[in-house]
């Protein structure tokens, strides 16, 4: 048994039960973005949260314990992603990554955007030419320090 096995059980149960991530998140009173990441194995749940997730997805006590183990974050394969949606993010960073970096440094100075002190919001935006995806990534700026 591994955390990946628990993730697969969660995805299977979600499909079989016809659940939406937003509905799961509402039961935890947390964002759909964070709860989805947690259910997919990228965040650590506390005991109370793990119990709720275990109840929603009919997980065992052993599975529930795996939800509370600190994950190996960013554990996607290191090769270029082949899933079309994930690849588009890879492509966006390849095309716009240096631009984003330059604009952040120009605005804030030398540093990084935190993925720890971080929020994400994903919304559908109606458009007569076809609905659009609006993703806001909100991370604390962390300047490099001199020593």
From Swiss-Prot:
Matches recorded under SMART domains: Cyanate_lyase (SM01116)
SUPFAM superfamilies, per the entry: Cyanase C-terminal domain, lambda repressor-like DNA-binding domains
EC numbers on record: 4.2.1.104
Keyword list, A-Z: Lyase
UniProt GO molecular function: cyanate hydratase activity; DNA binding
Gene Ontology biological process terms, A to Z: cyanate metabolic process
Reactions catalysed: cyanate + hydrogencarbonate + 3 H(+) = NH4(+) + 2 CO2
Gene3D superfamilies: Cyanate lyase, C-terminal domain, lambda repressor-like DNA-binding domains
Full protein name: Cyanate hydratase
Organism of origin: Methylobacillus flagellatus (strain ATCC 51484 / DSM 6875 / VKM B-1610 / KT)
